């Protein structure tokens, strides 16, 4: 078996190094909507114009965040402009999580995670959106996955960061309940967003998000959202059995790009999700030297990966191929799934220089793989 060789990436744009990343939370130009659904009101920010039959990029944030703190530094990054000039963007804020949201009345029943997914149908209908490419983080990745399972014709692709497809077990559920009694919700959320190493070393970044969660997010509403996420059901997705005459209806039908940082607390959950998805439509991207917020810490690399992913779907054919040095990786298992470097797969080299015409997007569509980004 050949030794795995790490993918190297030439960094042209600097990573987010500002001591106050919160300055990047400012919103870009967009039209805000409060959309009534049968399950409550959804706050939506729409940017750009829809283009014929082209899908819209639809984002959904994680617990403790809203669309501004989760995605604005990413979508304001220069490299993302090459993508957003081709697509309209629709940012979803989970109920009560937008900046300045009032508290829900006493006794309010917050939507379940499945109901949050149902609410997206009304959003698409209201905005006359025909299909989406979803970009979700954590809880938002779960919501978009559930939506894709229920509405496969409306979802052309998914970029899922830090997804956990599993329901919490009784022990984990009890531990999360206990943590609310012994720890404030801000610290609970920080433990979800950041790995132990980040909490100890990335003090400026963690403090920025600590202040944001404590000051910009309604604490009562946040606790309801966290409880909803912790009470989620298992997605019950199953990897298709190749050669079987009975197709499974419990798998995501569209192409999926799974993303996780190697220091993220969600690594094991993302690998578990990868093992359940169709390997012919799924790519697992693990970022080295990155924790729980790849879109904040490594925006250039994530933007490049999304560009290749979207090109593999047949969009943006003329966009430039600039930075990645690629390594074509093949599955070491008979099922075709890829594992993260803790369980090394074998690799054959195929370098992509900036002058090369070869596209990683073709590789993404051809075979399941793990791409390890190093900086």
From Swiss-Prot:
Protein name, as recorded = Protein NDRG3
Record's GO cellular component, any one? cytoplasm
Name the gene that codes for it. Answer: ndrg3
Q: Which GO terms describe its biological process?
A: signal transduction
Q: Which PANTHER family match?
A: N-MYC DOWNSTREAM REGULATED (PTHR11034)
- Region annotation (Disordered) maps to 326-375
Segments of skewed composition (Polar residues): 364-375
Give start-end positions of Low complexity composition bias.
348-363
Organism equals Xenopus laevis
Query: InterPro entries from the xrefs?
Result: AB_hydrolase_fold, NDRG
Q: Which family does it belong to?
A: Belongs to the NDRG family.
């Amino acid at each position: 078996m050949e030794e795995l060789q790490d993918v190297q990436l030439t960094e042209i744009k600097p990573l987010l190094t500002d001591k106050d990343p919160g300055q990047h939370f400012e919103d870009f130009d967009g039209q805000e909507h409060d959309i009534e659904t049968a399950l409550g009101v959804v706050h939506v920010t729409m940017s750009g114009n829809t283009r014929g039959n082209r899908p819209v990029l639809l984002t959904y944030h994680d617990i403790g965040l809203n669309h501004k703190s989760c995605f604005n530094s990413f979508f304001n990054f220069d490299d993302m402009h090459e993508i957003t000039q081709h697509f309209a963007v629709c940012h979803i804020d989970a109920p009560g999580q937008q900046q300045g949201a009032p508290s829900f009345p006493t006794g309010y029943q917050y939507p379940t995670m499945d109901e949050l997914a149902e609410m997206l149908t009304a959003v698409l209908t209201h905005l006359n959106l025909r299909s989406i490419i979803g970009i979700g983080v954590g809880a938002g990745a779960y919501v978009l996955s559930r939506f894709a399972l229920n509405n496969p014709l409306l979802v052309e692709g998914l970029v899922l960061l830090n997804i956990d497809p599993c329901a919490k077990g009784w022990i984990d559920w009890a531990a999360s309940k206990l943590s609310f009694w012994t720890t404030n919700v801000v610290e609970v959320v920080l433990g979800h967003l950041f790995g132990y190493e980040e909490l100890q070393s990335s003090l400026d970044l963690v403090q920025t998000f600590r202040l944001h969660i404590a000051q910009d997010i309604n604490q009562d509403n946040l606790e309801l959202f966290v409880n909803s996420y912790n009470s989620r059901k298992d997605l019950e997705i199953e990897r298709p059995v190749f050669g079987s005459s009975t197709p499974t209806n419990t798998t995501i039908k569209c192409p999926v790009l799974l993303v996780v940082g190697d220091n993220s607390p969600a690594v094991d959950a993302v690998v578990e999700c990868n093992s359940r998805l169709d390997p012919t439509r799924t790519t697992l991207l693990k970022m080295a030297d990155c924790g729980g917020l790849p879109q904040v810490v490594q925006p250039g690399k994530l933007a490049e990966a999304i560009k290749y992913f979207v090109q593999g779907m047949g969009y943006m054919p003329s966009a430039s191929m600039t930075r990645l040095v690629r390594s074509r990786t093949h599955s070491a298992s008979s099922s075709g799934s890829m594992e993260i470097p803790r369980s090394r797969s074998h690799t054959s080299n195929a370098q992509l220089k900036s002058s090369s015409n070869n596209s990683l997007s073709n590789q993404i569509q051809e075979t399941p793989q793990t791409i390890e980004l190093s900086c």
